[in-house]
Amino acid sequence: MIALYPRLAYTSDDKQIYHSAYGMFYDGTVVCAGYALTYSAILNYLGIPCKYVISDEMSHAWNIVQINGKWYNVDLTYDDLYMTLGENAHSLIAHNCFLKSTAAMSGNTGIWHKGMSYPDGITCDDTTYDNAFWNDINTNIPVVNGNYYYIDCNVNNLKFNIVKRDKNGNTSLVCNDTYMTSGQRRVSSNPNNSSDKHYYNIFYSPLIGYNNRLYFANVNY
């Protein structure tokens, strides 16, 4: 199911079209409601139970999905790094809110969701995936021939490894720190002190699975 994590463009535009799944087909742009309705449509079409969840307290919407008879939270909006990085978020997808329990999504130790209202008396108590391997991965995770693939990037030098992970959790490197990722050196400035600047790296290289092959891009290709 992780391969079905869609990457749309989040917007703060409050037009009604962006509150619906149609916004995705119109111009690939949605608000939280559009994200949740799109994901529900995709998963239910594929036979994966998925429901729409709201929080009036947060004025926010996301999903719960059922895996092996248990329900988990999925919030694509919070995992859309465009919200925090804007146009610098190209090719980046977070997974911090993917298949999480209620405890992991709320409270001081969670991801600050509150006022959750689950339909049909559903609870999301299972913690199986709260500490899953994808938590720290900010790239797409394609599935090719039954194996997961993702980019492990060294943000200090923008070199990256492509990691293969099988269904048993065994990992191996497809390439070892060979490629320089497409990236950018960013500056964070203190608006009250022009000399107070902090530098950090972000990376953009996409990783895509298609027809049982992996495709990626770096600064040389």
Predicted features along the sequence, with ranges:
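Secondary-structure boundary elements
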Residues: 1-24
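Extracytoplasmic/periplasmic, Sec-exported soluble proteins
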Residues: 24-35
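Hydrophobic/aromatic-rich core segments of domains that either
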Residues: 33-100
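His-Asp-centered catalytic microenvironments across diverse enzyme cores
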Residues: 70-183, 201
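Hydrophobic beta-strand segments that make up the repeating blades of beta-propeller
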Residues: 148, 214-216
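Recurrent small/Gly-Pro-centered beta-turn motifs in extracellular repeat architectures
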Residues: 152, 218-219
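Blade-loop segments of beta-propeller domains
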Residues: 188-191, 200
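Repeat-blade elements of multi-bladed beta-propeller folds
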Residues: 205-214
